[in-house]
Regions:
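Short hydrophobic beta-strand element within catalytic cores of glycosyltransferases
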Residues: 201, 206, 210-213
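Acidic donor-binding loop of glycosyltransferase active sites
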Residues: 175-194, 209
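A conserved mid-protein helix/loop that constitutes part of the nucleotide-sugar donor-binding site
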Residues: 100, 104-123, 141-147, 195, ...
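Nucleotide-activated donor-binding/catalytic signature segment of Leloir-type glycosyltransferases, i.e.
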Residues: 144-176, 180
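Short glycine/serine-rich donor-binding loops of glycosyltransferases
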Residues: 194-201, 219
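A short, well-ordered alpha-helix in the C-terminal region of glycosyltransferases
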Residues: 158, 238, 245, 252-267, ...
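Donor nucleotide-sugar binding/catalytic pocket of nucleotide-sugar-dependent glycosyltransferases
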Residues: 35, 41-88
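Conserved acidic donor-binding segment of nucleotide-sugar-dependent glycosyltransferases
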Residues: 222-236, 245-251, 266
């Protein structure tokens, strides 16, 4: 028997208490904001059999918080995704009305950096590149602010906020070749919030869709090797240049798509990730 909790916040607090009452060994996975907020991490590190971080930056943050004598309990295991049935080819399609289709599947919150993609789209149009559509799939407190920004830049013809859609519908868009590019212009916001390794990127990469994102949070660990295009945060010009290159260079597009798919298949396959986690359970079972 073993208790494992996801998130270093309330779920792991419940697991910590349950373990103390039942005497069943326990462990937890820490993601991102739950590390920054601490959440009794020193005490949890003392009693947990192991702690799983999902990326190098998260692991480093955990190590800086907990006592040195507990750092041996830290392990990095990515969040996996199901890579079955990824039968899309790597050709871009200019899917609807001969337009290149860009989407950002993310909550409308500061750390997702939507405003910088809006500004990048404005730059593309200034360069005469108008054969694209950009859709934001998500909801959040910035909805009205982003609508105002889109209108201020006269981009209603090019950018639409579609709201949240069911996850399976998003995956069907990928599978049915309705999307050419994912752009996630993430930032470290004024509160210090940042990305881990976003599933919005890994899922798209698994379908052979190129991704553009920024050098924040755990993102460099995913695409810093050329498996996607990485730019500096808050840099609309770099975003625009990256989008333009993918739109105009089909061979480059295919190369990025293939590298991205291989990266996810090799390192983020849910079966591989599950086995790594099971191995930790087995190791700790033998020592108890």
């Amino acid at each position: 028997e073993h208790i494992h909790a996801h998130w270093a916040s309330t779920p792991s607090t419940v697991a910590y208490i349950a373990s103390a009452i039942s005497n069943i060994p326990w462990s937890f996975t820490a993601h991102r904001w739950d590390i920054a907020e601490n959440n009794m991490l020193e005490e949890k590190a003392r009693t947990a059999e192991f702690i799983r971080g999902i990326d190098e930056q998260g692991l480093s943050e955990l190590a800086s918080i907990i006592n040195e004598k507990y750092r041996y309990k830290l392990n990095k295991i990515h969040v996996g995704i199901n890579i079955n049935c990824r039968n899309r080819d790597n050709n871009f399609l200019y899917g609807n009305d001969n337009n290149f289709i860009i989407i950002t599947p993310a909550n409308l919150v500061l750390k997702k950096g939507h405003r910088y993609l809006i500004e990048a789209c404005k730059l593309l149009i200034k360069k005469g590149i108008t054969n694209f559509k950009c859709y934001f799939f998500g909801d959040g407190y910035l909805h009205e602010d982003l609508l105002i920004l889109i209108k201020e830049h006269n981009l209603e013809e090019y950018i639409s906020i579609k709201g949240q859609i069911p996850h399976n519908e998003l995956l069907n868009l990928y599978k049915n070749k309705n999307i050419d590019l994912i752009v996630l212009p993430s930032i470290v916001d004024k509160y210090g919030n940042k990305e881990g390794i976003p599933s919005a990127l890994t899922e798209a990469m698994a379908y052979g869709i190129p991704v553009i994102s920024t050098n924040t949070g755990g993102i460099p660990e995913l695409i810093g090797d050329g498996s996607g295009i990485m730019v500096n945060q808050k840099d609309p010009l770099a975003l625009a240049d990256a989008i333009e290159k993918l739109m105009k260079d089909s061979e480059y597009y295919k190369t990025i798509a293939e590298k991205g798919r291989k990266k996810v298949e090799d390192e983020f396959n849910v079966n591989k990730i599950a086995q790594e986690l099971l191995n930790l359970f087995e190791i700790n079972k033998k020592t108890n």
